[in-house]
Amino acid sequence: MTISRFHLAFPVIELESTKKFYTEVLGCKLGRQSNKWIDFNLFGHQIVAHFSPDDCIKTNTNMVDVDTVPSRHFGVILSWEKWLALCEKIKKQKVRFMIDPKIRFKDQNSEQGTFFIQDPSNNVLEFKSFKDDSMVFKK
């Protein structure tokens, strides 16, 4: 199945720390860049960090199970193996988890692994994986 790629633009406070985070921590490949923005390849999707400090604002939260989840966040649904590997990579780099890696809905059809981290501009990213990928959009 071929999946369309998404494009997401988001504000950042500063470009150099952003470049370091997305390339070194997450392993993104660099695309085009200027002195105002940087393109990244995030697991095959195009994300663009735009220098716009005034738009980097605190986000509200919602409760999901027992976690306080930022309502504004983005991320990628990975295969179980890639999710586990990314968890380990981030732990080894001593990046602070906003929400530690965990399994939600254990032993249910919608069982999923999830964790949240923040970039240097406080943009929140969630990486998750479904034990059964066919359950991503099931009710």
Predicted region positions:
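N-terminal beta-strand motif that seeds the catalytic metal site of vicinal oxygen chelate
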Residues: 1-17, 74, 78, 129-139
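A generic structural signal for short beta-strands and their flanking turns/coil linkers
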Residues: 4, 36, 45, 70-72, ...
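Vicinal oxygen chelate
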Residues: 5-12, 41, 61-139
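Core segments of cupin and vicinal oxygen chelate
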Residues: 10-56
